A protein has these predicted regions:
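Bacterial N-terminal signal peptides
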Residues: 10-20
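Sequence context surrounding c-type heme c attachment/ligation sites in exported
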Residues: 24-176, 194-198, 211, 231, ...
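Canonical positions in the second alpha-helix
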Residues: 190-191, 224-225
Length: 246
């Protein structure tokens, strides 16, 4: 919609689908009394479709933002902070689409929407940030359990990047903190989950093993790198240095 940065009409919900919406959406009023960011002349169908897109983007229901009393939704109430936050986010999206997107691309072809960042998460965070937070609270075992749980629930749905890059970056964070044992645990899980073949991933596995005092494993890692990529002179040098150790 033009006034807040989404294309008006692009989210229209077919009338036949309205009958199959959850009960809270079927309570939708015919007149709207408290529109502050969305166009005041918006149609019921368009507003319902827009709100539905918000709900899908955050994986929430109407009562996430709207007050519910005795199984009925008070759509006009501003009592919930989440509704106030949603307005701010809509204003932010509008500013991005109106004032910035057009400067770097064709504004008709690219538009930021809620789902652009949220991807079905109420609180969108990169997986690396989630793992760092869990490591600080629950240690490495809790972190590994969380990764496996999230992967089992969200793999292939777009909420998180479960690939080797995320775990490589998380391992680099652990190594910088001298958490060598934890780094090894993450990288071994990385190989078990993703079966990576990149030089970068093998390098980090080797460095983790080396810094954790597992020299034989580190040498095996570097041998694998040289086998896969004979031109990798750095890996060959590291292997030679480790082989000279007594």
């Amino acid at each position: 919609m033009a006034s807040f940065g989404l294309k008006r009409g692009c989210l229209l919900l077919p009338a036949i689908l309205i009958a199959f919406l959850p009960a809270d959406a079927q309570q939708f009023p015919d007149r709207f009394t408290n529109l502050q960011v969305l166009p005041k002349d918006i149609s019921k169908r368009e507003l319902l479709s827009t709100m539905r897109s918000f709900a899908f983007a955050l994986d929430v229901r109407c009562e996430h933002c709207h007050v519910q009393k005795d199984k009925e939704i008070d759509y006009g109430s501003d009592d919930k902070q989440s509704k106030k936050t949603a307005r701010v986010m809509l204003q932010m999206v509008g500013t991005i689409n109106r004032d910035y997107i057009g400067k770097v691309s064709n504004p008709k072809s690219i538009q930021v929407e809620c789902v652009t960042c949220h991807h079905g998460l109420t609180q969108p965070q990169p997986l690396k940030a989630v793992l760092i937070e869990e490591q600080e609270k629950q240690g490495i075992d809790g972190t590994i359990n969380l990764y496996r749980d999230l992967r089992s629930r969200y793999y292939g749905t777009g909420q998180y990047d479960f690939g080797e890059t995320t775990l490589n970056q998380f391992t680099e964070f652990l190594l910088a903190k001298n958490m060598h044992k934890e780094a090894v645990a993450i990288m071994e899980m990385n190989f078990a989950a993703n079966n990576p073949q990149s030089v970068w991933t093998y390098h980090i596995l080797a460095m983790s093993h080396e810094q954790n005092g597992e020299i034989d494993k580190a040498k095996a890692d570097y041998r694998k790198v040289v086998e896969l990529h004979p031109e990798d002179s750095w890996a060959q040098k590291q292997l030679d240095l480790l082989s000279q150790r007594k």
